[in-house]
Amino acid sequence: MGLEKSFILFSLLVLVLGWVQPSLGRKPSVQDFKRQHMDPDSPPNSRPTYCNQMMKRRGMTKGSCKRVNTFLHESWATVKAICSQRQMTCKTSSRNNCHKSSSTLHITDCRLKGSSKYPNCDYTTTNSQKHIIIACEGNPLVPVHFDASV
């Protein structure tokens, strides 16, 4: 009887872990990338409130303030095409699934101001034209992670 209960409890535990684990170890997705980084319809602008508005609108100030984020002011086709560039090691990890843009892109960098604390997330807005490095996955390859701008 005790062995039977243990088996039932173990089976239940395996089921629960199988249900919970995918959300814990969730891989980055193309939808996350688009939400966090794509803003093709807005040209880069120097409005100091751009980052504050966009970070909040895109859900990056829920529960805490995301420290750094980059928005890309290019078409999805332009960004996706970077995945066809030569593969390289990522700058922020040892993964080897990154690709660097062959030309500079219009970007906006958002950086949390040093004195800013949740829930009042306050960002500096910096526009520039830089090469970007993104991680790509899947078949066909699609952007899933913004790695760096150089």
Curated annotation (Swiss-Prot):
It is found in: Secreted. The lineage of its organism: Eukaryota, Metazoa, Chordata, Craniata, Vertebrata. Endonuclease that catalyzes the cleavage of RNA on the 3' side of pyrimidine nucleotides. Acts on single-stranded and double-stranded RNA. GO terms for molecular function: lyase activity; nucleic acid binding; ribonuclease A activity; RNA nuclease activity. CDD domains: RNase_A_canonical (cd06265). Monomer. PROSITE patterns: RNASE_PANCREATIC (PS00127). Its EC number is 4.6.1.18. This is Ribonuclease pancreatic delta-type. Keywords: Disulfide bond, Endonuclease, Hydrolase, Lyase, Nuclease, Secreted, Signal. Belongs to the pancreatic ribonuclease family. It comes from Rattus norvegicus (Rat).
